[in-house]
Curated annotation (Swiss-Prot):
GO terms for biological process: ribosomal large subunit assembly; translation. This is Large ribosomal subunit protein bL20. InterPro entries: Ribosomal_bL20 (IPR005813), RIBOSOMAL_L20_CS (IPR049946), Ribosomal_protein_bL20_C (IPR035566). The keyword Ribonucleoprotein applies. Gene3D superfamilies: 6.10.160.10, Ribosomal protein L20. One of its GO terms (molecular function) is rRNA binding. It comes from the Bacteria. The gene is rplT. Belongs to the bacterial ribosomal protein bL20 family. Binds directly to 23S ribosomal RNA and is necessary for the in vitro assembly process of the 50S ribosomal subunit. It is not involved in the protein synthesizing functions of that subunit.
Length: 117
């Protein structure tokens, strides 16, 4: 049986990696070995940062809610505790949006939380 070289498979694999490395600076976008290393690292970063994005957005929402609460004379933890006691089930994303865009409705929620604490 004749020896089979990995011609077409290798070319296909190299093209796939170089396509993923498109736009990288210098040899990281041109040479297969270096591009392959960079693509592997980039995919690792992408996986990690998809998890981190969720944490960062939650932190941002909490910061916005806290700032709006303090303008209305209540701390964040008392506000959240008051909402839970009042039976209000609005997630932090919606609360942050209300705090930025609909201050009147947010103020009503703050009053409700103050009464139930």
């Amino acid at each position: 049986m004749p020896r089979v070289k990995t011609g077409t498979n290798r070319r296909r694999r190299h093209k796939k990696v170089l396509k993923l490395a498109k736009g990288y600076r210098g040899t990281k976008g041109n040479l297969f070995r270096i591009a392959n290393q960079q693509v592997m690292k980039s995919l690792t970063y992408a996986y990690r940062d998809r998890k981190q994005r969720k944490r960062e957005f939650r932190r941002l929402w909490i910061s916005r809610i806290n700032a709006a609460c303090r303008q209305n004379g209540i701390s964040y933890n008392k506000f959240i505790n008051g909402l839970k006691k009042a039976g209000v089930e609005i997630n932090r994303k919606m609360l942050a949006d209300m705090a930025v865009n609909d201050e009147q409705a947010f103020g009503e929620l703050v009053d409700l939380a103050k009464k139930s604490v």
